């Protein structure tokens, strides 16, 4: 499944002659699990989304998971990452160690070994062409859903809701 599945490749590349990955419409995401982040102790905590200059447009997040464990991550449009000649892992490390809102919160925190993971998210934003339009997600007898249809929200990076709705419609 997903944006790179054989069916999506066939619909997008072969039938509609569009690029499978357009870096202006894909976000890179990177996350790690951390223990002991100040303000995220115990089983209660708020989801935090922060817009930091080094990852703009994009954001840095803290998602408390319970028992003091936190999903810490960063996401940014791939095209802009390439222009900055940087990697999300490096950007995240810099935010954690140097940003005034976070460096004190991570002083005693410990990253869970092997928890770092990166991925790409296909945005449902308009593509190039005579008329800006979403990525082609259909053909005779075929309707792509979820990531295969590039239905990730370009603002939030969330796609589960759109995937469920598209599956229901299909």
Predicted segments with their positions:
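Generic helix-packing signal
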Residues: 12, 167-170
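Predominantly flavin-linked oxidoreductase catalytic cores and closely associated redox partners
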Residues: 1-108
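FAD/FMN-dependent oxidoreductases across multiple families
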Residues: 80-168
């Amino acid at each position: 499944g997903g944006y790179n599945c054989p069916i999506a490749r066939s619909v997008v590349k072969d039938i509609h002659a569009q690029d499978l990955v357009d870096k202006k419409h894909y976000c890179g995401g990177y996350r790690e699990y951390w223990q002991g982040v100040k303000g995220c102790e115990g089983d209660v905590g708020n989801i935090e989304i922060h817009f930091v200059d080094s990852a703009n447009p994009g954001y840095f997040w803290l998602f408390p998971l319970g028992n003091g464990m936190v999903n810490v991550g960063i996401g940014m449009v791939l095209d802009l990452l390439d222009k900055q000649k940087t990697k999300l892992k490096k950007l995240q490390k810099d935010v954690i160690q140097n940003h005034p809102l976070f460096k004190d919160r991570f002083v005693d925190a410990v990253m869970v070994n092997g928890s770092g993971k990166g991925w790409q998210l296909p945005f449902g934003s308009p593509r190039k062409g005579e008329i800006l339009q979403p990525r082609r997600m259909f053909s005779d007898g075929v309707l792509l859903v979820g990531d295969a249809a590039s239905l990730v929200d370009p603002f939030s990076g969330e796609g589960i809701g759109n995937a469920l709705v598209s599956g229901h419609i299909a």
